[in-house]
Amino acid sequence: MRRQVKKVLREKADDSMKPGWDVYQPSNDVVYAFNHYMQGSQIDAEAREKAEKAFQEAVKKHPFHNNADHAVDFHGTTVFRNAKGKVCGVLIPKALPSFATSMAADVLECAVARTSLRSALFGGVSPNSGIAGYFDYRGTPVELKCRKTSFTYEHTKEWRSVFPMIDYTSAIYKAALPDHWKAQDAAVPDVVRIHGSPFSTLTVNERFRTASHTDNGDFDNGYGVLAVLKGEYSGLSLALDDYGVCFNMQPTDVLLFDTHLFHSNTELEAKEANATWNRLSCVFYYRAALGEQPCVEEYRRRLKKAKEEKSTSLSFNHIEQKDNGENTNKPAPVYPVPLTPFSCAASAWALRGCAAAMLTRLHGLVRENASLMTELFGEPVEVADGLPRRAPEEIIPVHKHTNVQMHYLGGFSEKGDILNEAMNKRHYLDKENLQKMFGEEFVNIWTQSRTHWLQLVKKEWEHQKETNPTRTRFSWNNTSAMNFAFFDLCDVAKQLMCGAFGDREVNKKEEQSFWGMFAAHLDNACINEIGMLQGSMGMHKLNVKLKDYNFGGTRYLKDMPPEEQERRRRRRLEIEQARRRAPICNSESGDWLRNEAFDYQTEDVAVNYEREQWITPENNAKRFGFPERGVYGAEGAATGTISVLIVLPKPTNHRQKTCELPTSREADRIMKNPAAQRLLCAKPCNIGLSTSSNKSRTVLCGNIRIDKVFDGGSVGGKMYDFVIMRHLLAATTGEREPLECLVRWTSLARYCTFVVEVDLLDRHHYILKSEIGEEYSAVSEICFSALYSATYARDKVNLRTTPCLLSFIDKSGNMLESRFKFNGSPLNTVAFVVRRREK
């Protein structure tokens, strides 16, 4: 069953889930967990049309973006700035010591833990998210606000294992962006800062992919920090959607970024739909509401109460109202940067200073002079009439066809196949299954409430049968004790549902699905446990009463005497407390719901790095070479001549013989676009150089000196600022030749090399529909080889995919900084920015 996240259908984020509110799993996408279960194919055409229109409008507000939607993938240490020079993101690979992320992951996995019951009830693999640290809980039904999260409260001892990761992350933030770190550190109230850091809250996500969103509630004058703690996966890069760039992240990597920019995750790069993968990530941030007056007053109230009770373990004597700044929760303004391979390379931290200034100069020149871009790379940054973009119908959707929210009247749908599904899953509410998820106390409450209602139903049924022995249908008395017992049982069931969904807001389809199983469970109990006839109670009657509970229960409560209203409220609180005390990851039970103690910072302990023989956070941050001012400074202007070497594949004596090309829709897409036709008709671009000479040819363009040479030729021992290897590896064979080619030419670059190649993988490779992907794979190599042969006059062509090219780059002793994708390129060209690995 495909499931898609509810959040794409809502305009406002659920603060309790930020920043993972609009997440989904690539193999388990959700707008509604039980879309087929609740609606199925029986929905009428008019309703389907309205639903699809509503869904499309929602997706416009919160779209999912794929890797192909972005021009740049950053891999190395990167500082990406907007057109006004403001830092948008800082990527630091291998930033955190692995022992620190491992220790933290062991604890924080419990914060997102779900049991197998939830998957059994609602299908698929549960996407997990949780919060730790401190939270304001505004806009939630939690009565007591501005305090520890339930996870932190219940895992005080284990929580200490997270502190090294907190310290390392804070030190990196301080070293890279000291001004913002200081502003955030000055604003966060001391009572809710995590281990002396400028963070108040962690959001932990497991197996999550987010749609485009901004993080609501973060401190406006700070940055959020994303770290990947553990995982085995490819893809899922963090993308800044308005800038067209992605940050590739793996375990121990850290990304500092402006969370008020729209961002999302690209697709999981796994071709098999059932591929095994996992990813645990953590977002560190300051929840600005915790510094606003309502929360400060709550801290003061608790402190005053603790003093009146003569508490001896107070960590504070007074609460200071700090300057919290202005937090508008509005998206940050966007100042786009035109993207070229040079601007892409200029973002590499390793190329800062003189190299970045040169790259910025080259970027400006190719922006002003499109012919210079073609002279250097063989094609423009973007080709309007080249390889066409994929149509939506060619791509596996994030969701299957879904039927979006309609007016909810409580209860559940009574369509035949849906009722059958509910009956098939009714046993998940049996006691032995509930014990897998909930503690004994809560299961006992469920059992007692269920037994009490069944006893009253049995008593009422027997009375009705005595009055009329031929009766076959149960008559429900709305004023009876049985009715009130049913409402009480519904209160217990509602807490069961909340627990199964991890206290997140449940969308209406999920809620209807649950109540359908609940009704099927009770109807079966009436038949098999108290001897009622098949259909005497019936799903329809229970559905009517569930609608009454959802929309009429509050009205009945208001009509009750005050003492009964208070008893019902206490009863509901008792049920919720029992459910929350369910053991998760062997947590220590605690009365979190009613906790009013002034227990801020009671979990804090010092970390002795010297005793543990761990690198200190400050020394760890120094590894990345950030200056005292951080990464804010823009590069100066380049002066003097910039030298560039272009290396071309040597043409053979004749073009590749014309071969019979396949005929198919995919072959036509590659070969018959106007840009491809121009390549086939034009003279090969490397014919102008003399094939009889092995020496380079020099072209001057202002203060740019461009040398051109064939692969195998000589440059007379010169070094160059930058080298552009233009489609060389496609002219090599085997494993050894491409490595030797890379080693030779990258060694001549003072700063970096651009490895420009055809990528045999379709840009949407991992999300192409299977029939489209198979057709593409069958023709792509022969078609692109024909285009390459026409462009470079080569007999033998060995085209490769990005993963294969990345392997060559790594084995050749080079480091990958980034990848640039030429939009619409008829050769599906990509440029890898690489530099020699430091010894």
From Swiss-Prot:
Fe cation binds at H213, D215, H263. InterPro entries: 2OGFeDO_JBP1/TET_oxygenase_dom (IPR024779), DB_JBP1 (IPR041241), DB_JBP1_sf (IPR043111). Residues 415-583 are annotated as: DNA-binding JBP1 domain. It is found in: Nucleus. One of its GO terms (molecular function) is DNA binding. Disruption phenotype: Does not affect growth, gene expression or the stability of some repetitive DNA sequences. The genome contains only about 5% of the wild-type level of J in their DNA. Cells lacking both JBP1 and JBP2 show a complete absence of base J. Keywords: Dioxygenase, DNA-binding, Iron, Metal-binding, Nucleus, Oxidoreductase. GO terms for cellular component: nucleus. Monomer. Binds to DNA as a monomer. Dioxygenase that catalyzes the first step of DNA base J (beta-d-glucosyl-HOMedU) biosynthesis by converting thymine to 5-hydroxymethyluracil (HOMedU). DNA base J is a hypermodified thymidine residue found in the genome of kinetoplastid parasites, which is localized primarily to repetitive DNA, namely the telomeres, and is implicated in the regulation of antigenic variation. Also specifically binds to base J-containing DNA (J-DNA). The DNA-binding JBP1 domain (DB-JBP1) is necessary and sufficient for binding to J-DNA. This is Thymine dioxygenase JBP1. It comes from Trypanosoma brucei brucei.
